[in-house]
Amino acid sequence: MFSTDNLYEVVSFSTDTTKTGNKMGRLLLKDTTTGSMLNCMLWEERLNQHSPKTFKPGNILRIISATQNPNYNNCTLENVKLIKEARLGLNEEETAFYWNKLQSYISKIKDEKLKNFVLEQITKHQDSFKIKPAGISMHHNFAGGLLVHTVECLEFAELNMSKFACEINEDNIYAATTLHDLGKIFEYNIDLETGAITYVDTFKTDFISHSQYGYCLCLTNGFKMVARMIAAHHGRADWGAIIDLGERDIEPELYFLHLIDNMSAKYGKINIKMFDEE
């Protein structure tokens, strides 16, 4: 149930087209008082009455008027007021900081062939890698989110590798961690004016997922273990993993990447507001 007294943070926003051809907006709002989530929608007429920037992830809104839809467990927004606008993503200084950290981790790869391959991929796509999000709603859904998520995973990897009692290949860990979400630069678009994040329609016609992109890239270049780690980093087939970690005799590196990816996605700086709370 929505409240006109409480403030709401925009968690995610996307637009869709109905079967009749009408445009509609979908929002996930977080009640800043209770922490509860609210699924919302706006019909095209109401959507057009608001600035596109109103629904930027991280924005703080007040619901002025809406209708609760108990049968669908959502509410139809009619009018909202923007209370505080969130920034779009990383600023130049933050981007430079995370980019330099990424380069420092790539330099830790001792195998020259593997290091040069990773560096080539990241350098070739650096403009996109610096601004693309890591997700639409789940985590790091802001400009520069992919860069932040990747560096966080590398930090978790560095901290935890020495704790593994079994033998693991550090070069493969650093390489797979750096490249595991590279495919997201082709999978997502972000509007640098409004912050709206959308899927690239043509991506899924060429690749099933960003995991498949990374897997194919590394496998065709001769880095089989790195490819396998990327294939398994979602953990379970029903979560999008190409290799399900429920299978027997899985190499420890495959579990490792999945676990550190999950830690960043749940406990890292998953939204831009967290950068202003330091």
For each predicted feature, which ranges?
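OB-fold nucleic-acid-binding modules
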Residues: 1-7
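Histidine/acidic-rich helix-loop-helix segments that form or flank divalent-metal centers
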Residues: 174-177, 187, 192, 200-205, ...
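Short, acidic/hydrophobic/Gly-rich beta-strand patch recurrent on exposed beta strands
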Residues: 26-31
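Acidic/His-rich, divalent-metal-binding segments that scaffold phosphate/diphosphate chemistry
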Residues: 85-201
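OB-fold single-stranded nucleic acid-binding module
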Residues: 13-24, 36-39, 45-89
